[in-house]
Design a protein with these regions (language model features):
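Conserved alpha-helical "signature site"
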Residues: 1-194, 202-302
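Catalytic or ion-translocation cores adjacent to nucleophile or general acid/base/metal-coordination motifs
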Residues: 198
Length: 302
């Protein structure tokens, strides 16, 4: 997605692809058509695509449904989350980290709810669940780039939830869309690992753009398989479409995706990206600056 600046515009999708892929292009490029044809097949067959990544825990769609119920209580939310013991353990470990700074150790979900509130617990729950999906990869290439992909996903989700109210979108749906939008890219990396020799990742501009587009459609299809709200899949499928830049959730997700990619690219100090950060409008710069606060908290946690 281009970002407005002096000519020529920056294409952050393409720049991020090259930044992600560059260290892993070590040999002759493999067959681009082979990869793109397989991704096109997975776009048409989201059920098969969804088997290439761990499934989102069943509690996530349940939590989403409870959001639409006026009768849903904190106790209902705690009961839903308690169905997944592994998820509960990860949530409690996370909520006791320096990032959240609890005054006393939190030992159960009720304590986490008191500290975070319902919306805060929902977001933490989603973050823990999707981190497992993106980070626990066995294929070589997906495993190597998963830390960067998770970093971008987490930042995109954070920004999308902050931008959602400005666009009339639901903050939690925006947060989930940010976490979900790179899942198709994980699938694409697994496809590349299965079809091409090590080091054979193609890195042409044309391939990068087509891969990113196909991966988004795969993400959207998997979101449907996982029973996430249709608005999430729609927003992901239309990321970067000019016709949706001013419409609710797609607009919030599009801006968030750009900000998250820009933050990671600007971290390398390249003048073009640093200048793009300096040119951000005030409202977007405020959201961008929250990434630094989160990174600082994560370093303290480490």
């Amino acid at each position: 997605m281009p970002i407005a600046r002096e000519q020529p515009p920056l294409d952050l999708d393409l720049a991020f692809f090259h930044w992600l892929a560059g260290p892993h292009v070590t040999g002759a490029a493999g067959d681009e058509a082979l990869v793109l044809d397989e991704l096109a097949r997975l776009v048409r067959d989201p059920q098969t695509a969804s088997t290439l990544v761990p499934r989102v825990p069943a509690v996530i769609p349940q939590v989403l449904r409870s959001l639409r119920s006026d009768a849903a209580s904190s106790a209902d939310l705690a009961r839903q989350v308690a169905q997944d013991a592994v998820l509960v353990a990860e949530v409690l470990r996370e909520v006791n980290s320096p990032y959240y700074q609890p005054g006393t150790p939190v030992r159960n979900l009720e304590g986490a709810l008191l500290l975070l509130g319902q919306n805060g617990l929902r977001m933490l729950l989603a973050r823990v669940a999707f981190r497992r999906i993106i980070s626990l990869q066995t294929s070589r290439l997906a495993r190597l780039v998963s830390p960067q992909l998770w970093n971008q996903s987490e930042k995109c989700a954070q920004a999308a939830s902050l931008l959602a109210p400005r666009h009339g979108a639901d903050p939690f749906e925006a947060y989930l869309a940010g976490l979900m939008h790179n899942v198709g890219l994980v699938v694409a990396l697994r496809v590349i690992d299965g079809l091409l020799p090590a080091g054979g990742l193609p890195d042409s501009d044309a391939f990068g753009l087509r891969l990113v587009h196909a991966a988004r459609l795969v993400s959207a299809g998997i979101a449907g398989q996982w029973e996430l709200p249709p608005a999430i899949g729609h927003a992901i499928a239309h990321l970067g479409d000019a016709a949706t830049v001013s419409t609710s959730l797609p607009a919030a997700l599009g801006q968030a995706d750009c900000l998250a990619k820009l933050h990671m690219l600007a971290g390398g100090g390249q003048p073009a990206f640093v200048a793009a950060v300096a040119a951000l409008p005030v409202g977007l710069r405020q959201v961008y600056d929250t990434f630094n606060e989160t990174d600082n908290a994560d370093r303290q946690d480490a």
